[in-house]
From Swiss-Prot:
Protein induction: Expression is positively regulated by the apicidin F cluster-specific transcription factor apf2 that binds to the eight-base-pair motif 5'-TGACGTGA-3' called the 'Api-box' that is found in all promoters of the apicidin F cluster except in the promoter region of apf2 itself.
Biotechnology (record note): Apicidin F, like the other known apicidins, is a cyclic tetrapeptides with anti-malarial properties via histone deacetylase inhibitory activity.
Protein origin, superkingdom: Eukaryota
Protein name (record): Delta-1-pyrroline-5-carboxylate reductase apf3
Organism (species): Gibberella fujikuroi (strain CBS 195.34 / IMI 58289 / NRRL A-6831)
């Protein structure tokens, strides 16, 4: 998303101004300020006021069909944007209603340029979205995770057949502002799988951190000391896993000196069927993700 010319402007409309949307807006403004123009909606007037205070230079609308959101010209550098990405950042149950609003907008105002519609909802398929949105819509399903809040997210994406290479690139650039790892997935079901792995994985990590901290405290460490040691250890291990080209099993083996305390700890996890429990948890999550689109 270069910023050298007005033709490179990307327009972003956020339907919903919740936590994920705010994280992405913050990242976009910091990373691409001169080459992105952003509008955002919210349902409640109080939320609209909060967003307007937080983002005084952005267009903030109550509801999804306001003329100021769709009928006002995109004005940054005085040119029509090269790409328009509409990000649907609402709860899954609200997605069909949002798409109905978008159909209304399309019939009354049209779109220039034709937008790419992006969702962040597991379970809701491109076929469903294509049925709800204007005919021939370009749709990208995505699954970011909560570390986008510190711009360290991981995001899986799946594009329908209508999405062009230019549209896919514009969407990837938007997520890259908050997500160093961007992965386009070839099979759509992979998005629901990614939601169960990368989407949920922060909770797995936080739970393990909490257990380790509690164990340290129970054996006499001060809570702040245990917390600092465990969190930094997790950060360091993640960085090592990213930078070291060897397998994860090799990295585990490095820590597990034969006959040592860590090896004994890993043996205890195996006795408790740790791997099987985690795999079963992933299955539960995956079943729930797939069911969302059927509710």
């Amino acid at each position: 998303m270069p910023s050298s010319t007005s033709e490179d402007i990307t327009a972003c409309t956020f339907i919903g101004g919740g936590v994920m949307a705010r994280c992405m807006i913050d990242g976009l403004l910091d990373t691409y300020n001169n080459s992105v123009e952003i509008r955002v909606t919210a349902r409640r007037s109080a939320h609209v006021g909060e967003l307007a205070t937080r983002y005084p230079t952005l267009v903030v609308s109550q509801g999804n069909i306001s003329p100021i959101l769709w009928d006002e010209p995109w004005h940054k550098l005085g040119k029509t944007p090269a790409a328009h990405v509409v990000l649907i950042c609402t709860q899954p149950w609200a997605t069909s209603d949002v798409c109905q609003d978008i159909r209304y907008v399309y019939s009354n105002y049209g779109f220039d340029p034709e937008p790419t519609f992006v969702t962040m909802c597991p379970g809701i398929t491109t076929a469903q979205l294509e049925g709800w949105l204007p005919k021939g819509a370009s749709v990208v399903r995505t699954m970011p995770n909560t570390p986008v809040a510190v711009r360290q997210g991981a995001t899986a994406l799946f594009a329908n057949k209508v999405v062009t290479a230019q549209q896919a690139s514009a969407v990837a650039d938007i997520f890259r502002a908050v997500s160093p790892q961007i992965s386009f997935i070839k099979q759509e079901d992979g998005i629901d799988i990614a939601a169960s792995i990368s989407g949920s994985s922060p909770a797995y990590v936080f739970k393990l951190l909490a257990i380790l901290v509690e164990a340290g405290v129970s054996h006499g460490l001060a809570p702040d000391v245990a917390g600092a040691l465990v969190k930094q250890s997790c950060l360091g291990a993640a960085m090592q896993a990213l930078q070291d080209k060897r397998s994860l099993q090799s990295l585990i083996a490095d820590v597990c000196v034969p006959g040592g305390s860590t090896e004994k700890a890993m043996q205890r996890l195996d006795e408790g069927e740790f791997s099987a429990v985690v795999a079963a948890a992933v299955e539960k999550s995956l079943d729930a993700n797939r069911a969302m689109g059927k509710e």
